[in-house]
């Protein structure tokens, strides 16, 4: 379906009490306006005209990778004026969809319904019924058809009783919309050029106006303050959780789950409360994620358990692994099948081989660790000299004792043993035992220091 979109995003958002443009505030980890852009892109919009004003530099920096036409509205003179700034780019025969950068939850299904409903030469308008319509423009009908929209400040007492309200979202043909916009005036209580006045203009020409309701009323809720944004966040997360439950994912507490990206799950996955998913995350079959974990841009294979309060970012975890509790896997971390990393272990840019373990209090950075190797508690790969980073290579079946420092670059061959407390600075041959502890001494009659009076 051939259409272009105009996204209005020029408002300041005074009630947000923020230095950032309102539409850049995030919902599910993504700027509100980015949700709208992504929806239009997914539907195949030919052009996306983004009307911006306040905080223009921030807008263009944050959305630098988006394929949009940047349309400046230097003076905010109303919604009609905003759309008119983009009108020189409209093709006469294309559908023009008007959306809002602070209405982030509008769904592809609702937009498709609206595009399909546009009568030839007329307007399709998205409306919704509200028990409390205060503050919204009212839909005026005459014997059924929509004939006008009256804003709250211009409405009579009788019109204020109407519960059907305008969402501002509409579709019209480019040539018609340009003509109607050119005829707008600002003779109203706000002194603004209302986009809603094109409804009356279309009616005066005998054009049909078709009203369509959204699939879900929450889709058309806008954001004016942080309380509204928080409410939409919870609504969005509830919808995401419901989809995952329907797909077979066991969310132990759907009300305490946040998805801020994309999640792919295999069969029989279980996610406990207060888990946060960011970026692109993939879980295999029978994966268990404990409470309080944060997963970002990572892949976790079948039958792996991630125990509570672990953070995994930019990492790959194999099958049958155990992670945590309180583990941090940083970008470049790779755990092969049946690897174990436990509490207060940090791994960065390192591969831990099949069946190997680092169960306690360990930092492994810029390292390659072979199979069936045991890394004792308190082991540190000393990979950074203040200017450059160096690699530690540990072979198969190696035992590294507790409280060891491995000063890179260093290689430990297969089957070697590193005694507890060792500071290793040289390579170790296959099967060797290395120990660098200071010889133990016993001092009899030693007196512990006392505080001076």
UniProtKB/Swiss-Prot annotation:
Residues 227-247 are annotated as: Linker. The keyword Iron does not apply. It catalyses: alpha-D-glucosamine 1-phosphate + acetyl-CoA = N-acetyl-alpha-D-glucosamine 1-phosphate + CoA + H(+); N-acetyl-alpha-D-glucosamine 1-phosphate + UTP + H(+) = UDP-N-acetyl-alpha-D-glucosamine + diphosphate. Acetyl-CoA binds at residues 377, 383-384, 402, 420, 437. One of its GO terms (molecular function) is UDP-N-acetylglucosamine diphosphorylase activity. Its cofactor is Mg(2+). It is found in: Cytoplasm. Its main location: cytoplasm. The keyword Nucleus does not apply. It holds the Pfam family Hexapep. Catalyzes the last two sequential reactions in the de novo biosynthetic pathway for UDP-N-acetylglucosamine (UDP-GlcNAc). The C-terminal domain catalyzes the transfer of acetyl group from acetyl coenzyme A to glucosamine-1-phosphate (GlcN-1-P) to produce N-acetylglucosamine-1-phosphate (GlcNAc-1-P), which is converted into UDP-GlcNAc by the transfer of uridine 5-monophosphate (from uridine 5-triphosphate), a reaction catalyzed by the N-terminal domain. Homotrimer. In the N-terminal section; belongs to the N-acetylglucosamine-1-phosphate uridyltransferase family. In the C-terminal section; belongs to the transferase hexapeptide repeat family. This is Bifunctional protein GlmU. It comes from Vibrio parahaemolyticus serotype O3:K6 (strain RIMD 2210633).
């Amino acid at each position: 379906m051939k259409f272009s979109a105009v996204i209005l995003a020029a408002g300041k958002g005074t009630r947000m009490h923020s230095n950032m443009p309102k539409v850049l505030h995030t919902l599910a980890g993504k700027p509100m306006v980015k949700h709208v852009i992504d929806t239009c892109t997914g539907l195949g919009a030919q052009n996306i005209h983004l009307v911006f004003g306040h905080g223009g530099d921030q807008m263009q920096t944050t959305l630098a990778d988006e394929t949009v036409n940047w349309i400046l509205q230097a003076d905010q003179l109303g919604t009609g004026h905003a759309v008119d700034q983009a009108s020189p780019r409209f093709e006469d025969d294309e559908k023009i969809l008007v959306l809002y950068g602070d209405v982030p939850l509008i769904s592809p299904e609702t937009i498709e319904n609206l595009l399909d409903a546009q009568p030839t030469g007329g307007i399709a308008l998205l409306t919704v019924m509200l028990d409390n319509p205060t503050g919204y423009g009212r839909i005026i009908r005459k014997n059924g058809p929509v004939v006008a929209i009256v804003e709250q400040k211009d409405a009579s007492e009788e019109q204020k009783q109407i519960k059907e309200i305008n969402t501002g979202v509409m579709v019209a043909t480019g040539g018609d919309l340009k003509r109607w916009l050119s005829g707008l005036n600002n003779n109203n209580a706000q002194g603004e050029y209302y986009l809603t006045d094109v409804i009356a203009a279309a009616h005066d020409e005998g054009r049909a106006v078709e009203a369509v309701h959204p699939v879900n009323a929450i889709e058309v809720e806008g954001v004016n303050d942080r309380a509204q944004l928080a409410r939409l966040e919870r609504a969005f997360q509830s919808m995401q959780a419901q989809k995952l439950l329907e797909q077979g994912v066991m969310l132990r507490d759907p009300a305490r789950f946040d998805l801020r990206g994309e999640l792919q799950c295999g069969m029989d996955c279980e996610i406990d409360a207060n888990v946060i998913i960011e970026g692109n995350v993939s879980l295999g079959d029978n994966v268990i994620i404990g409470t309080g974990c944060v997963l970002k841009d990572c892949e976790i294979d079948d039958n792996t358990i991630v125990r509570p309060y672990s953070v995994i970012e930019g990492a790959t975890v194999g099958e049958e692994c155990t992670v945590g509790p309180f583990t941090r896997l940083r970008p470049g971390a790779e755990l092969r099948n049946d690897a174990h990393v436990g509490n207060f272990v940090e791994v960065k840019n390192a591969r831990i081989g099949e069946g190997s373990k680092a169960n306690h209090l360990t930092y492994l950075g810029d390292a390659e660790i072979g199979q069936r190797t045991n890394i004792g508690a308190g082991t540190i790969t000393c990979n950074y000299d203040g200017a450059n980073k160096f690699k530690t290579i540990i072979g198969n079946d190696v035992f590294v004792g507790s409280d060891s420092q491995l000063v890179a670059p260093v290689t430990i061959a297969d089957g070697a043993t590193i005694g507890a407390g060792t500071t290793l600075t040289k390579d170790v041959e296959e099967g060797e035992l290395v120990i660098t502890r200071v010889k133990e001494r016993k001092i009899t009659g030693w007196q512990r220091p006392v505080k001076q009076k």
